[in-house]
């Protein structure tokens, strides 16, 4: 994955004069698929490199992203614990511009688990990552709007393709992201 990212950035630097750097941050709402839990709020922040102009562009990026879930009690009691999983995401998106300001995008995303904080209802915490696979693959889809003065906004959904093997259960991270950014 690291070599692929370096190659994409290198091709972009030397292959086109229509390339732009940018930064992006926003709110994330994450949950596990096929798991009895509630969504957990978090944030994401990172950068991207948009290669291309006009109708189509490739956009590799890198971002810090909070994922995870809130486990609830068996009888509908308040939240039992919050499990926050922190990842470095590396998406490679294909953007298609339908109007000068409106685009849709999709592509693969590799993620590496960098830390975890499991907060139990009794106040104790666990930071061990042994019960979770250290990487995952997802598909990303979304829609973006280019605003005046280089600003942009987007809504995206990360759909986990590969199981996180969470305590030997077949669950995947699913994340809704609302972002604002700036393109230099």
Model regions: which residues?
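Sec-dependent N-terminal signal peptides
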Residues: 4-13
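Outer-membrane beta-barrel "beta-signal"
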Residues: 144-151, 172-184
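Flexible, solvent-exposed loop segments that connect beta-strands
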Residues: 31-37, 66-86, 114-135, 163-176
């Amino acid at each position: 994955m690291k070599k692929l990212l370096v190659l994409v950035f290198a091709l972009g630097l030397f292959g086109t004069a229509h390339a732009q750097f940018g930064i992006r941050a926003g709110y994330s709402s994450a949950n596990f698929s096929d798991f009895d839990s509630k969504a957990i709020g978090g944030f994401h922040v990172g950068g991207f490199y948009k290669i291309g102009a006009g109708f189509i562009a490739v956009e590799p990026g890198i971002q810090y992203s909070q994922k995870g879930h809130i486990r609830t009690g068996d009888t509908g009691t308040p939240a039992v614990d919050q499990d926050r999983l922190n990842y470095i995401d590396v998406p490679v998106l294909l953007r298609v511009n339908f109007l000068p300001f409106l685009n849709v995008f999709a592509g693969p995303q590799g993620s590496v688990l960098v830390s975890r904080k499991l907060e139990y209802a009794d106040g104790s915490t666990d930071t061990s990552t042994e019960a979770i696979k250290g990487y995952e693959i997802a598909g990303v889809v979304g829609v973006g709007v280019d605003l005046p003065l280089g600003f942009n906004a987007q809504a995206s959904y990360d759909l986990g393709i590969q199981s996180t093997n969470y305590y030997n259960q077949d669950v995947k991270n699913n994340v809704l992201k609302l972002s604002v950014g700036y393109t230099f």
